[in-house]
Amino acid sequence: IEDVAESIAAHLRESAVVLHCAGARGPEELRACARHGAATGVMHPLISFPSSTASPSLRGGTFTVGGSPRAVRAARRIARACGARSTLGITTSPAYHAAAALLANGAASLAFSSVTILRSLGFEPRSAERAMAGLLRSVADNVEQLGVPQALTGPIARGDSETVALHRSALRRIGRPLLEAYDALGPVILQCAQAAGLDDERAEAIKRAFRSRK
């Protein structure tokens, strides 16, 4: 970003607004443009871009914006023109970008694991992918409508340790990496369940199910 900023800075008018879209970098990356009078800022899309040649729909998405007041105003106008929302946030923190990556990259990777399980059971690849995509959309709807942690569903959310044990036994037979992924997520899901009101007794039963070697 800094190299590009250096290359264009001398060609900018003082009325220019320059924005970059990197979520883990702040507006200081554009300091060369700022020195030439441009308003600088960040406009990071909380939208997944899986391809460098095809742009996803921006409508309904959210941009996190930051920078000088003039740059922020311009970024908000661009977001509205795209049919998207904008929110003023701390875009200079790698932790902010980690939050976005954890969800976007984690969801895609978990979909890969889930599709792998379904394919081992005889699902056609595209049928499995469409099924998991529909499930992901329903989760997104629940997060938007109910918020977190209320959007959490499933056996850990209701303290069903017997079903957790059945899941682990089945995954152990399919492949240890899948069981390891399930076990790694267990404490995170349990933390969410407890925030939603799962009582201590059932939480302990869930922990025992994860410790079991069966």
Model-derived features with residue positions:
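Acidic/histidine metal-binding catalytic segments
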Residues: 125-132, 178-182, 203-204
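Internal alpha-helical scaffold of NAD(P)-dependent oxidoreductase catalytic cores
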Residues: 33, 39, 54-145
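Rossmann-like NAD(P)(H) cofactor-binding subdomain of soluble oxidoreductases
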Residues: 1-54
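A general structural signal for well-ordered alpha-helical segments in protein cores
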Residues: 1, 26-27, 72-75, 99-100, ...
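Short, basic/aromatic-enriched C-terminal tail that caps enzymatic domains
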Residues: 198-214
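Short acidic/histidine-centered micro-motifs embedded in hydrophobic/aromatic stretches
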Residues: 131-135, 184-188, 206-209
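Interdomain hinge/lid region at the active-site interface
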Residues: 141-202
